[in-house]
């Protein structure tokens, strides 16, 4: 699997996780302990098929839950990136993912703003259509992959270096802009009295992703390498700061926690 596709999946999970924490700190989301060699399960298509359509009438938390039910756990995604990528140095991958983690407050604001904007259109039914599209996430995977591939090809043409790494580094803005683009597409489809709004969204999704990504990647500063960055350590630290040590402990193994404690003592 190409780095850019895995990177986008990771960015999607990071953003969704951040928004969940922001909207409902007490939200009891099941977390599996990440072992030394985690296995990433295939998304369960039946989950999306069985989601009650009444989710469209619930809060933003419901939308994000539908997303999280269809993507791997955040720890497994990051581990998969590290194991599956060829041609990218480990320290580069650590650095860029840690950069996204460090920008978590901005990710929360970006996703929160985009989804709140969508929710504000609920009175004309737009929010229901956006929600139903997200619930049917498995159908959206192929257009997303196409959009990512278009983005990569355009970035190559424009001479962007470290394309995959830059996609992740700029993920907060990209996620926000893509959600905004989908919202506008739904609104336009309703104005045009389109019979199948989801089909309209799927048709335009590759272009939406490519359009919002091209200018961002073309104008983004060169990727900065930091060989001293350790992804897992930063992730655990940020988790403790955000959701507390007990919840953070549920997301990682005891060995990882022990390593982090040892690191703190070494730095003291």
UniProtKB/Swiss-Prot annotation:
Q: Where is the signal peptide?
A: 1-18
Q: Does the keyword Chloroplast apply?
A: no
Q: Does the keyword NAD apply?
A: no
Expression triggers: Expression is not markedly induced by human epithelial cells.
Q: Which GO terms describe its molecular function?
A: toxin activity
CC annotations in GO: extracellular region; host cell plasma membrane; membrane
Which compartments does it reside in? Secreted
Example GO biological process: symbiont-mediated cytolysis of host cell
Keywords carried by this UniProt record: Cleavage on pair of basic residues, Host cell membrane, Host membrane, Membrane, Secreted, Signal, Toxin
Provide the domain comment: The N-terminal alpha-helix of peptide ECE1-III allows insertion of the toxin into host epithelial cells membranes.
Q: What does this protein do?
A: Secreted protein cleaved by KEX2 in 8 similar peptides (ECE1-I to ECE1-VIII). Stimulates biofilm formation.
Name of the protein in its database record: Extent of cell elongation protein 1
Q: Which organism is it from?
A: Candida dubliniensis (strain CD36 / ATCC MYA-646 / CBS 7987 / NCPF 3949 / NRRL Y-17841)
Q: Which gene encodes it?
A: ECE1
């Amino acid at each position: 699997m190409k780095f850019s596709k895995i990177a986008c999946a990771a960015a999607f999970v990071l953003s969704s996780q951040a928004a969940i924490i922001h909207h409902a700190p007490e939200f009891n989301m099941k977390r599996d302990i990440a072992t030394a060699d985690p296995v990433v399960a295939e998304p369960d298509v039946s989950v999306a098929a069985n989601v009650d359509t009444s989710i469209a009438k619930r809060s933003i938390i419901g939308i994000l839950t539908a997303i999280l039910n269809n993507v791997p756990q955040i720890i497994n995604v990051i581990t998969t990136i590290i194991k599956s990528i060829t041609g990218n140095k480990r320290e580069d991958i650590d650095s860029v993912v840690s950069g996204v983690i460090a920008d978590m407050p901005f990710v929360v604001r970006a996703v929160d703003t985009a989804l709140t904007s969508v929710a504000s259109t609920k009175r004309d039914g737009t929010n229901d259509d956006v929600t139903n599209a997200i619930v049917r996430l498995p159908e959206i995977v192929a257009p997303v992959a196409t959009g990512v591939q278009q983005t990569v090809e355009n970035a190559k043409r424009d001479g962007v270096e470290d394309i995959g790494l830059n996609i992740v580094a700029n993920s907060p803005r990209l996620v926000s802009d893509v959600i905004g683009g989908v919202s506008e597409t739904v609104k336009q489809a309703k104005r045009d009295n389109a019979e199948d709004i989801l089909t309209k969204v799927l048709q335009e999704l590759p272009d939406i992703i490519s359009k919002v990504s091209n200018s961002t990647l073309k104008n983004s500063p060169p990727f900065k390498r930091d060989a001293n960055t350790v992804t897992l350590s930063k992730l655990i630290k940020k988790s403790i700061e955000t959701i507390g040590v007990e919840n953070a402990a549920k997301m990682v193994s005891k060995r990882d926690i022990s390593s982090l404690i040892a690191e703190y003592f070494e730095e003291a």
